[in-house]
């Protein structure tokens, strides 16, 4: 009997984990550059000749590498990265570097270039934008001051790093950290030398809302089924207990 309860607990935990993944995808559907997480269902080799029950499968979550739709905004501080393996470098605290595809940049009260309130890093460190200047981001990643269609000054060049998304661990709000067990690290990994950006454009998230909603409904049904099985198990246990009490 305990094996039934353990199976229900295991299945329910899988459902909760999957539901958390789906909820995170839907929450970040409007986060520029966010990469959705998908689930891979693998039939265990030793179980191929048995009935296809849930316990016979291995579930593995993985990141969707596909680039999101490039959407024109015409905002001078918006830009998207062309190469799917290139990432903007963000400082989320004095000791922590993160990576993002989110090119929806803003200037804070200190004239610092930020994304989601975190400083964006250039080749020479944090980037500060002069006041009352016409800013243009060029395709090679330079932030330029333009006056009368003439280049006056290059403020900075974005620092980009090249990582496969599997080298990164998701943190929050479209920000990723380098895997702790990865042999690479921020300091010894070379910066991208051939930067390719498009300005006035953002990369949308690659979340498929319809697919995630279907998965969420399916998970809810699976959860209801587990609750019904548990209820039936409790009823059968109580009936067996009453039967035994009548015979003693």
UniProtKB/Swiss-Prot annotation:
Compartments reported by the entry: Bacterial flagellum basal body
GO CC aspect terms: bacterial-type flagellum basal body
Entry-linked InterPro entries: Flg_bb/hook_C_dom, FlgE/F/G-like, LlgE_F_G-like_D1
Keywords on record: Bacterial flagellum
GO BP of this protein: bacterial-type flagellum-dependent swarming motility
Family membership noted in the UniProt record: Belongs to the flagella basal body rod proteins family.
NCBIfam families: PRK12641.1
Subunit structure, as described in the record: The basal body constitutes a major portion of the flagellar organelle and consists of five rings (E,L,P,S, and M) mounted on a central rod. The rod consists of about 26 subunits of FlgG in the distal portion, and FlgB, FlgC and FlgF are thought to build up the proximal portion of the rod with about 6 subunits each.
Protein known as: Flagellar basal-body rod protein FlgF
